[in-house]
Structure formats: C-alpha cells, structure tokens
Design a protein with these regions (language model features):
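Periplasmic/cell-envelope proteins involved in peptidoglycan metabolism and beta-lactam response
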Residues: 1-285, 321, 325, 378-392, ...
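Beta-lactam-recognizing serine transpeptidase/beta-lactamase-like catalytic domain environment
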Residues: 4-11, 83, 208-222, 235, ...
Length: 595
C-alpha cells in the first residue's frame, strides 16, 4: 500500500516533464526551421540574387538627366577670340566631415570672395549631409581650394561653363551676354544661341530620396552632348576698338546724350565695326543700364534729315524725270500745303545764284531744293525708290531687336508729306538701314544684305560654313550710282562737308545730316541729331562709314559734330587696309634766274 502511495504523485510530474521537453523540442525545431529558412534566404539574397538586387537598388537611385554641351566661342574676322567658355566647378561640403567649421569658413572666404565668413559658417553648420557652398567657381579658385586640402570640402565639375570675355567693352553691344547657365540673353549670344549652345546629351547619376544629385557619385554618359558651333563675326577688332575710341571722344567733346558709328563693306555687306556710346562691360552686364546695353545702330529709328536727300536724288535721276542739267530756282523758302519750308541756317545757302542743279542741292544741302525735286518726281516715284532701297523693311543683319523704321504708305501721306520726306522728315530709319542704302550707291546700285556673321566653326575647329555676300536686288542703275557718288564728292570738296570730312591723301565722299529729335508725335525743342555718312575712297569705295551724334551741345550740324569723326575713321580704315595716302606734293618755288 505504501509503495503504491509513493508512486502515485510521480506520474503528474513525469507527465509535466515530458510535456515541457516536447515543447522545448518543438520550439527548437521551429527555431531551427526558421534559422534554416533565414539562412537559405540570406544565401539567396546575398549570394544568389545579391548582384541582381544590388543592381536594382542602384537603378532605383539613378536619374536620367540632360546635360549641356560645351558652348561655342565667338571670334572676330581674323580668328581672335572675343568670347569663349571656360570650365566651371561647384564647391561642396560634406558637413559631417568638416572638423573646424570656423577655420574652414575663413579659409574658403579667402578664395570665394562672393561669400562672407558668416554665410559660409552657416552653410557648413547645416544639418544636411552635404551642401553646395560655391557655384560657377573659376578654375583658379577651385585649384586654390584644392590646395587647401580642407576636410569635407570637395570640387565637382559643372555641366555648363563660364563665359570668358578678354576685352569686356569691345563690341559689347554686338556680342551681348549670357545668363548664369550660359543661356544667350542679348546680342549675338542671343541671336545665335541655337548654334552656340549645341545639342544636350543624356547622363545617369545617383540621386538621394529627394531627387537631388549626389555630388560625389560618378555620372555615366548615355548620349554624348554635341558641342556648340563657334561663330566667326565680320567684326575687325582693330577697327572696332578705334571706332569706339573715336566715337567716345566725339560724344564727350559735344557733351552729347549718345552716339553710334558703323563701318560697312559696301561690296559684301559685312559689318566691320559697330559702336555705341554709352556702352558697358559685358563682364558686368548686371550692373549696366538698359541705355548702355542698347544697340542704337539697329534699334533706334530716327528721322535721317539731310542724309536722305541722296535717296530723293536717286529717285529723280533713276526715273529720268530729272537730269544732272535740270535747273531749280534757288530760293530760301517754299510754302506747300500751308507749311513753309526753309533751308537750314548753317551758313551754307545758295548765295546770289538764281538757279541750282541737283548737285548744288546735295552739296549745299538745300531743303527747299530737295522739296522741289520731290514735287517734280511725284509721290509714287519717291515711294517706290524708298522701298527699292529697303526703307521700312528689316535688314536682317543678324542682330536682335532690329527696328524696321517707318515709311508711311502713300494713302497716309498728307499734302506736305512729299516735300518733307524729300529732305528726310516724316519718315524714320535706322543707321544700319541708311548705311545699306549708301552701300548700294557706293557699289554701283546693288542692295546688299548687311551681315554680322562670317563663318561657322565646328567643335573640332573646322570651318563648316562660310557666309557669302547676298544681293537682295538692284536699287538703282550703275549710271545713277556713279552720278550720286560725284554729288557726294562735291559735298566734301565745296559743300557742307568741307573741310571737316576731308582726309588728306584720300578722296572722301558723303553727306551731312541734321534733324530734330522726334518724340511722341512731335519734335523736342532744342534737341537735334547730327550725322555724317559717306565712303572712302570716293571713286571706288572700300568702306561706308556712318557717325551719328544724338543731342549734342554747343553745335548741332552734322558737318560739325559728326564729320570730323567720319574723317578720322576713314583715314584709320584705309591705313589699316594697307592703302597708303597719296603723296601731296609740296608747292615748288622756281628759282629766280639771274639776267
């Protein structure tokens, strides 16, 4: 009985022990199975599928983006670089690796002059893992930073470069400028932006969870960018520099509001020099005023005044309604449609002569005579001649912002329009359009398209296209052109251009112009534009030269304020072309013979 009693309590304990052991085995087997599963899974993930999954994760971090091509350079006609792109870099900081924030900020501020120590210190203290602390940094600056070997500071090349302009003011109104990312904004940089910028490429780069590029990751090019074309301008840097200098002196001498000058090859239409005062430094375009950036040669339409009398003479001669022998009454005033027209009070009047021919009218710049010529030929002949010379149309010179000027249609003319248009009032034109018309007279009657672009050069430096002279149409006959050149020569030898437009050793020809400043449908009291346009040499012109001085003080007439600058430019251009002045013989005194 006692043995039976002792064995009875053991059975529940043994059962509990067996159950506990069973549970332990089950847990073991479950954990073992899970371990096997995890091990197998880990093997699959890390060994079998590892490379594939890593590649997929890498691809998820990749962004495919466009990147800019290298922007082309701008050269003058002789291959001198006026503008080119230099590589630029960004400066990044991995903030966690920067050991001395204050010292690093001070060191960087000594190189990145546009950043203050305080601003750099704040950037370096940001919680972001990396920050950009310098954008469009020059090669010299980035090299200097690299030499500092600052912990946490790295240099990363940028997709776009920085435009380098060696002579900041030279031809600034022609060249224009680009924005921060090399987008053309003005001048030929804007007009030919599509050629200069090239075709963008595609590349993949690593990005963070916010889509921002990781600066230190190596990008991979998918489609290579095509470098932009470089362009060769028709500009002659030597002429350009000196025309700017001469124009600046003239504007300052007469305390004028502004001025512009143009040198054109009449046989090809090439713009050899184009200057404006005031001007600006392309490298500091952001601080330049709109007036300083204005290209007056193509943008400013004005009443040409007496320089337009030659167009009236061209219309008269080419129509056959007036000949060189035709005589007009020499008088100082003429009343038409209730308006009295006077000759200019500049001392160049007809004197005691009772009649004058077309050459006299041009040489002495008589408004009344020009009005009589206009009335003789009629409005249709006058209008058609203006249109043949291209007035009222764009010249398509290749510069942005061109103004076509205003030539009213015949149905808009009043009773006084014909006589006033005949001496350059009641219409407007630009210096480039007027120079194109005079170039036609200089070259024998052909209207040439003026152009600023000479050639295209590919990324490897090969000239792939050279622009040829483009004849638009015949404006006048060669006979008429020759007669007009003789008239313009008379302006210099005995008219309003004497002696200011004379260049010793060379023959010059041209026309003076003086006009009131037209504004808001009327004329500004006391405000004038003095101009001179002509060519050299007179018999076989190589250069058409225009000088325009706006709102001068102390004198107003083109023969006074503009012709001397024309003469200086003409002499310079001829000598630069290798044409030496003709020898002017000194007076020889015959010795007295003894008798």
């Amino acid at each position: 009985v006692s043995d039976r009693a002792n064995r009875a309590p053991r059975r529940p304990l043994e059962a509990a022990a067996k159950a506990s052991a069973l549970r332990a085995k089950m847990v073991f087997y479950v954990l073992f199975t899970i371990g096997i599963f995890l091990g197998v899974r880990l093997y699959v993930v890390q060994v079998h599928d590892g490379p594939k999954l890593a590649a997929r994760a890498y691809e998820q971090r990749l962004e495919t983006v466009n990147y800019a091509a290298h922007r082309g350079s701008i050269f003058d006609r002789d291959g001198t670089a006026l503008v080119r792109s230099l590589p630029s870099q960004s400066v990044y900081a991995t903030t966690g690796d920067v050991r001395d924030i204050d010292g690093t900020a001070r060191a960087l501020a000594g190189v990145l002059h546009q950043r203050s120590v305080g601003g750099l210190r704040a950037s370096l203290a940001e919680k972001s893992s990396y920050v950009q602390i310098g954008h469009k940094v020059s090669r010299d600056a980035s090299d200097a930073i690299a030499k500092l070997a600052l912990p946490g500071i790295s240099i990363v090349p940028e997709a776009t470069g920085t435009r380098f302009v060696p002579a900041g003011r030279l031809a600034s109104s022609v060249i224009g400028f680009t924005g921060f990312d090399e987008d053309g904004l003005e001048g030929v940089e804007y007009a030919f932006d599509g050629l200069l910028r090239g075709a963008p490429g595609k590349m993949t780069l690593e990005a963070d969870q916010f889509g921002r590029a990781i600066p230190f990751a190596q990008p991979r090019v998918v489609v290579a960018a095509k470098p932009g074309h470089s362009i060769e301008l028709t500009i002659d840097s030597y002429l350009q520099y000196n025309v700017e200098r001469i124009l600046r002196d003239a504007v300052h001498k007469w305390n004028a509001q502004s001025g512009c000058a143009l040198v054109l090859d009449p046989n090809s239409g090439e713009v050899l020099a184009l200057a404006n005062v005031p001007d600006y430094d392309v490298r500091e375009y952001a601080s330049a005023s709109p007036d300083a950036r204005r290209d007056r040669v193509v943008m400013d339409a004005y009443e040409p005044g007496s320089t337009f009398k030659l167009i009236t003479a061209a219309a008269a001669l080419d129509s056959g309604k007036v000949t060189p022998q035709t005589q007009f009454a020499a008088r100082d005033q003429l009343t038409v449609g209730g308006r009295t027209i006077h000759n200019a009070e500049d001392g160049f009047l007809a004197g005691s002569a009772s009649s004058e021919n077309l050459e006299d009218i041009i040489a002495l710049s008589h408004n009344v005579g020009a009005a009589e010529v206009g009335l003789t030929i009629g409005r249709h002949t006058m209008y058609e001649a203006m249109r043949r010379f291209g007035f009222g149309d764009y010249t398509n010179v290749g510069l942005p912002g061109e103004n076509p000027g205003i030539v009213p249609t015949i149905d808009q003319w009043s009773a006084t329009s014909l006589p006033t248009i005949s001496f350059g009032h009641g219409i407007s034109t630009t210096p480039i359009a007027l120079a194109r018309a005079y170039a036609a007279i200089a070259n024998g009657g052909l209207l040439m398209r003026p152009r600023i672009l000479s050639a295209l050069i590919d990324g490897e430096g090969h000239t792939v296209y050279r622009y040829a002279p483009e004849i638009e149409r015949r404006a006048i006959s060669s006979k008429t052109a020759a007669t007009l050149r003789r008239y313009l020569r008379a302006v210099v030898t005995r008219g309003t251009g004497n002696p200011s437009a004379i260049v010793p050793g060379y023959t010059t020809a041209g026309k003076t112009g003086t006009a009131q400043v037209a504004e808001n449908g009327g004329y500004v009291s006391g405000a004038y534009i003095g101009s001179f346009i002509g060519f050299v040499p007179a018999e076989s012109p190589k250069f058409v030269i225009l000088v325009k001085i706006a709102r001068p003080h102390g004198a107003i007439y083109g023969g006074v304020v503009a012709a001397p600058a024309f003469a200086e430019i003409a002499k310079l251009a001829m000598m630069h072309a290798g044409v030496m002045p003709a020898r002017i013989p000194a007076r020889v005194h015959a010795p007295k013979l003894r008798t």
